[in-house]
Design a protein with these regions (language model features):
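N-terminal Lys/Arg-rich, disordered targeting/topogenic segments
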Residues: 1-19
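N-terminal, polar/Ser/Thr-rich
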Residues: 17-18, 36, 57, 63-64, ...
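Hydrophobic alpha-helical transmembrane signal-anchor segments
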Residues: 19-46
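Soluble non-transmembrane domains of integral membrane proteins
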Residues: 53, 57, 64-65, 74, ...
Length: 304
């Protein structure tokens, strides 16, 4: 009998030890299981990141060959005037620049979109036909206090900026009153940004007329999005496209929109009071340019 009790007591000791360490064992087992589950999760996350990088590369490659997303700034007028200064008793003459933005900037655009494929990835691109109408006047220029007599109206530049000039499909011209001017590549140091086109024009008539109406058309390619800078005292944009999943972006949302399964139309109106810069910029700087860039708005052609 004593031997039986001793055997039972001996069996209780391992059982007690197991109970004491059972919680620790459970924690260790759970930790091992969690680690085993994390391994495929990390692998999946790495795969997602790699797919994301590959998609970005595919979009960049197609966009570089077709044309980048376009942001359009213009048209506007650059006027130059002589600036006389004295340095060490010597008189120096440099060139000052004044930018004059239009009183009205009305843009009507038709866009035809399509999807290009690069491997398993899709990139949205478009071809657009844009019509720009409006007018310039000297009203705001007179308010700015600049010396109109010093301005070289006979050598004014009509400036038009866009992001990627490869998207231009045909020659661009602008009609001012009854005169037509052809644009030249580059800005020749006359514009807000370095990328775009300009046309040298004799705008002496602007001093004589209260209004100088303009009209221009452009066929432009781009990818993913199109945006506009609201340079007009009143800017109105009307866009239509065969795209059913637009994402309206930028500093202003459209006042009216109509989106269906296959297309959309949208209208914006932006006043000069809605932005942080005036109709005239005298010897503009980086801060002025940043204000213009930050005021742009438009649409992103989102792939569903």
């Amino acid at each position: 009998m004593d031997n039986l009790n001793e055997n039972l007591n001996g069996m209780e000791k391992p059982a007690g030890c197991f109970r004491r360490f059972s919680k620790t064992i459970k924690v260790v087992v759970i930790a091992v299981l969690v680690l085993l589950l994390l391994i495929p999760m990390v692998m999946i996350e790495d795969m997602i990141r790699e797919r994301g990088r590959t998609q970005v590369d595919a979009i960049e490659e197609v966009s570089q060959k077709w044309s980048l997303a376009q942001t359009i700034t213009g048209p506007y007028i650059n006027l130059q005037y002589p600036v006389v200064s004295v340095d060490n008793g010597k008189q120096k003459v440099s060139i000052g620049n004044v930018l004059l933005f239009p009183d009205e900037l009305f843009i009507d655009g038709q866009l035809r979109t399509e999807i290009l494929k690069r491997g398993i990835y899709e990139v949205n691109v478009y071809q657009s036909e844009l019509v720009f109408k409006g007018s310039f006047s000297l009203e705001e220029l007179k308010k700015s206090g600049v010396d109109l007599d010093a301005m070289r109206f006979d050598r004014a530049a009509i400036c038009f900026n866009l992001t990627d000039m490869r998207g231009i499909n045909e020659q661009i011209s602008i009609m001012l009153n009854d005169s037509v001017y052809m644009f030249e590549p580059g800005m020749d140091g006359r514009g807000i940004k370095g990328t775009g086109v300009h046309a040298v024009a004799d705008l002496t008539a602007l001093k004589e007329n209260k209004k100088l109406p303009y009209e221009m058309k452009i066929k432009l390619k781009g990818s993913q999005s199109i945006n506009f800078s609201p340079l007009g005292k009143t800017t109105k944009v009307n866009l239509k496209a065969n795209w059913g999943t637009p994402s309206f972006t930028g500093n202003y949302l459209p006042d009216n929109r109509n989106v269906t399964e296959n297309d959309f139309s949208a209208q914006w109106q932006v006043l000069n009071l809605n932005r942080n810069y005036s109709q005239v910029m005298v010897d503009y700087n980086t801060s002025n340019i940043k204000d213009i860039e930050n005021s742009s708005f438009g649409v992103n052609f989102k792939i569903p």
